[in-house]
């Protein structure tokens, strides 16, 4: 009598696993846009992601937590069970912020992935809305955008050129680190609070870049 329920459960397992994999793939696709949709996807698929990463949530978004995004020793968290996403193994998540003065503010978030940038780019390509915009430069892959009148405009990558305080760039970047790839989004340069509200709902207002007046008062 117990055989039928057991068989039914066994038949359900592959479909459940497939649904979980599809949820992870959907979130990585959202991540590749380098905007707030990544955090909305983490919220929508939080049941799948909580098996792999520490999550915090609010009404509309969720995010993977690190101890301190401003600290080298606290801005990375290892992922449990090596989530299989689009045929790749994600090893850890990082969330970094740096104030480089006249060079600009830099916010990075993303994953360390097992494999080379070539391998990761091949797996990531089908998830990208415009894969041709991801350009190979030496051993890395780069997709660059410039903020212009509240819109993002695709530009040719400018390695070695810092945006400073005069412009804002958004970059999807695949870089080699040994046998692994650092898959990151970044927003950099003249980043202000209004932009972070749009792109990074996980960052609290207390960590927004300060204006010159706010720094002077502080």
Where are these regions (language model features)?
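Short helix/turn-capping signatures at newly exposed starts of structured segments
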Residues: 19-109
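Long, charged/polar, surface-exposed segments that mediate recognition or autoinhibition
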Residues: 81-157
């Amino acid at each position: 009598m117990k055989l039928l329920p057991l068989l039914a459960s066994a038949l359900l397992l592959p479909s459940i696993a497939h649904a979980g994999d599809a949820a992870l793939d959907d979130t990585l696709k959202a991540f590749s846009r380098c905007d707030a949709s990544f955090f909305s996807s983490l919220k929508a698929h939080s049941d799948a992601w909580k098996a792999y990463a520490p999550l915090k949530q609010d009404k509309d978004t969720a995010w993977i937590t690190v101890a301190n995004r401003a600290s080298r020793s606290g801005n990375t968290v290892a992922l449990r069970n090596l989530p299989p996403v689009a045929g790749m193994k994600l090893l850890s998540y990082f969330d970094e912020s740096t104030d480089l003065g006249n060079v600009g503010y830099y916010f990075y978030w993303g994953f360390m992935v097992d494999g080379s940038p070539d391998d990761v780019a091949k797996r990531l390509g089908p998830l990208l809305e415009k894969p041709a915009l991801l350009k190979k430069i030496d051993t890395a892959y780069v997709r660059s955008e410039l903020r212009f009148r509240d819109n993002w405009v695709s530009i040719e990558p400018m390695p070695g050129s810092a945006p400073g305080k005069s412009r804002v760039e958004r970059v999807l970047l695949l870089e080699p680190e040994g046998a692994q790839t650092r898959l990151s989004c970044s927003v950099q340069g003249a980043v202000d609070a209004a932009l972070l509200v749009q792109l990074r709902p996980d960052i609290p207002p207390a960590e927004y870049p300060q204006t010159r007046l706010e720094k002077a008062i502080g």
